[in-house]
Amino acid sequence: MRPSNRTPAQTRPITITRQFTAHAEGSVLVEFGETKVLCTASFTEGVPRFLKGQGQGWVTAEYGMLPRSTHSRMDREAARGKQSGRTQEIQRLIGRALRACVDMKALGENTIVIDCDVIQADGGTRTASITGACVALVDALNWARGKGIIKSNPLKFLIAAVSVGIYKGEAISDLEYIEDSAAETDMNVVMTETGKIIEIQGTAEGEPFSHEELLELLALAKNSIREIVDVQKAALN
């Protein structure tokens, strides 16, 4: 039995609130149960130096956790003077995932910067960030089209992400912190709306997992991501 009494395949309640802040071209508050992340998408004309003159755009991401997003306060990384390895890994994951769903040629020489700020953490912050950031990205692209900055829609498909794992010998979806911290296997999966894989991050935290368990976890993730994409589409409509 899971601590929340959810079934193994059941995700937490998921909500996506668009236009959550006033200034960003795209902004979303995404909630996976008690995990809450503010995702903003900022559209700027121009690209990094390494892309100048190539006629294509760029999408990148930054990620951070507010000091009291966790049970005890942690120092801001800006106060420490450097980002942790975890932060760098997560923001690279978010950026890679979002670049997979954008036609960079159609974006033109423009840049979208995604900022994911964790307001409250209860497991799955990186997967919630990707899910919310995708919706914020859609809004930023629609803003640019409305302004005539880009002509065609660069979005190739929606993407979403979920954590899956093996907890007390059972494959489960959308782990909250108490499950994540005690899981034998922890995996983050990013997929397209049609179920194609963009990225898999999987680690045997306690016990090695079998090929059959890997397939079970991926099937669990695919079904959960299908449900999460439905939430994205409902928010966008």
Swiss-Prot record:
The alphabetized UniProt keywords are: Nucleotidyltransferase, RNA-binding, rRNA processing, Transferase, tRNA processing, tRNA-binding
Gene Ontology molecular function, alphabetical = 3'-5'-RNA exonuclease activity; tRNA binding; tRNA nucleotidyltransferase activity
Is the Transferase keyword given for this protein? yes
Q: What is its EC number?
A: 2.7.7.56
Q: Where does phosphate bind?
A: R86, G124, T125, R126
Pfam families the UniProt entry points to = RNase_PH (PF01138), RNase_PH_C (PF03725)
Please give the catalytic activity noted in the UniProt record: tRNA(n+1) + phosphate = tRNA(n) + a ribonucleoside 5'-diphosphate
Q: Which GO terms describe its biological process?
A: rRNA catabolic process; rRNA processing; tRNA processing
Gene3D superfamilies from the UniProt entry? GHMP Kinase, N-terminal domain
- Ion transport: is it a keyword of this entry? no
What does this protein's UniProt record list under function?
Phosphorolytic 3'-5' exoribonuclease that plays an important role in tRNA 3'-end maturation. Removes nucleotide residues following the 3'-CCA terminus of tRNAs; can also add nucleotides to the ends of RNA molecules by using nucleoside diphosphates as substrates, but this may not be physiologically important. Probably plays a role in initiation of 16S rRNA degradation (leading to ribosome degradation) during starvation.
**Family named by the database record:** Belongs to the RNase PH family.
Record note on quaternary structure: Homohexameric ring arranged as a trimer of dimers.
Name of the molecule in the record: Ribonuclease PH
Q: What's the name of its gene?
A: rph
